[in-house]
């Protein structure tokens, strides 16, 4: 994986909830496909990297792999790679938005909601963490797979998008032919003894109502 990044070769590796082995897609030939209208995705096959809003400066990127679904074991990283992943998890030195910057953004959000410009907004903070020596995107992906066993985990790269690593328990869209499904989760609960809690607390019941 790290070699793909070094030679700027597009790829995506992902682990579906319930599966133990991630799948790897690679594109060795040609450039990725840039799409400026979601309708152009009809009939296409590949791994999609999409922004919230498609524009001329921020198109959908489609990795069209030459090789599909190669298994990628997650338990064969070295002791050194595991140590780097642990150091990244325990990193305390990072940069984030200042209180003044965050308060200004929050004020803008509140005004937009009060004016009914938007029905819902989500204000998030960003963290900038120093990269530790020996950092490996693959090691962090493997660590995420071990930690978030019920989530969809992905690591993808293209020269146009850079490196993206993500994790979500939500099914954005799944199905085939005339039957499709989606899931929207408002609640968040920590694992208990490695399993999802069977009883929801009051906070999560309200968010799902």
Residue spans of the language-model regions?
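Cytosolic ligand/metal-binding cores
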Residues: 26, 42-44, 174-209
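A short, Trp-centered hydrophobic/proline-enriched beta-strand micro-motif
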Residues: 9-16, 119-121, 151-156
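Short, flexible beta-strand-to-coil junctions
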Residues: 14-21, 50-56, 157-160
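Non-catalytic accessory segments adjacent to catalytic cores
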Residues: 28-130, 135
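SIR2/sirtuin-family catalytic core signature
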Residues: 133-176
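Short, structured patches in soluble enzyme cores that scaffold and shape functional sites
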Residues: 50-52, 125-127, 156-160, 167-169, ...
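Short Lys/Arg-enriched alpha/beta "domain-start" segment
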Residues: 1-31, 129-132
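Short, surface-exposed beta-strand-loop junctions and turns on beta-sheet-rich folds
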Residues: 20-21, 31, 171, 188-190
